[in-house]
Amino acid sequence: MYIDSIIIAIEKRLGFLIRGKYWLWKIAFISVFLFVVIDFTGNMSKVVYFRSFINDYIKQGKLDTAHSIIKAQSEDYFEFFKQGNQTGITSNQHEAKMRFRLFLPTLVKILGAKHFEIWLYFLTFILGFFYIHVIAKIAFNILGETTNRILVLFFVAGFTNLYAGGGSFVLDIVPYGDFFAFLFLLLSIYTRNPLLIFVYCQCAFWVDERALVNAILVMIWWIFMPFNGNKVTVKLNTQWLAVFISGVIYMGIRQYLTIRYQLHDDTYMGEFITTFKENVKMLSLRVWAGFDGMWILIVMALTILFKEKNYQFLMAFLGSLITSVGFAFIAYDVNRGISYGFIALLLSLVICKKYLSEKELKYILIVCFLVSILSPTLNKFRLVGGGQLM
């Protein structure tokens, strides 16, 4: 077929680029490069976005709201809690939403607050390449050593084009800090050491509470992950338990701080309901914006599980996805929330690898990548004032 010949020709050229010992790193760099080129040429307003970063932060040393709150938290966590209670900060204020997001303030406290708005961005950017490299390595482990390396490239390139990929560290000047939660969630499925899994999950939870909800996907990974060959089987283990215990401890500490500093706010539920109703008005677009074309891989995986009558895995996987998406809808930045469930993409790759041929999987990954870079979702637009519209 004509399409096959085109794909083979492309494979040969791409294969030349990812030869050698450090080919996984090459895939990481190529994927990030493609993301930057595609994202910036598709929306030149992001050039203005980075120009403001240089003028406001680097040259003038200005701090926006998020930076100011992080700095205040880093100076004294508990004083920040007390001030929040005394000044009557309500749930719709940004300060209230960042009360328990203590990872970035801790990082700033350890490494120093001087020019932190600059070094924090560059630290995130550098670690981003390591993050994509780990994604590539896990994808390679899933696909197997005999698999064509091009499949790894297609998957990683498609993933990097998402907010959960390159967007979280290339564009995060604000800073949201989501990248660190993504990194820790990824490391919690990369290592098999229960203690490290516990620590990584704790770090992710204190970056953003959305990581707690999506830790369900990490537990599903450890319960269903095929350790022996390509078998997808249920396996309860210490890794799963480490994730669960970490979540319980986080909730316990958070509840203690809420009671201790009288931070309970009855307005939260009303705000959540109002936000949910507003987001539902753009249901399809907001859901799609979470994973763009990579949703195709997830839908394919769910279809395969249903066809193979693997209802146990299907219900666990689908239930966790619905929970993740539902929780994302109680905040206005929906696709940020959905992005926290990116482990679903790796789970989907596991399923598709087991039941599809290499050629079929290759075509699916190519389509996922192409649709992701061509679809005009919320990731592609900008709000007045420089904030990401998500």
Where are the regions a protein language model picked out?
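Membrane-interface alpha helices of multi-pass inner-membrane proteins
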Residues: 185-187, 195-210, 214-221, 245-248, ...
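Membrane-lumen/periplasm interface segments of specific transmembrane helices
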Residues: 232-313, 317-320
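Transmembrane-helix motifs of polytopic, lipid-linked glycan transferases
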Residues: 122-144
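Perimembrane helix-loop-helix junctions
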Residues: 2-5, 214-245
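Short hydrophobic/aromatic helix or loop-helix immediately within or flanking a transmembrane segment
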Residues: 75-115
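Specific aromatic-rich, kink-prone transmembrane helix
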Residues: 171, 175-199, 344-348
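Aromatic- and kink-enriched transmembrane "portal" helix at the membrane-lumen/periplasm boundary
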Residues: 102, 117, 151-183, 206
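Membrane-water interface signatures at transmembrane helix termini and the short loops
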Residues: 290-291, 298-354
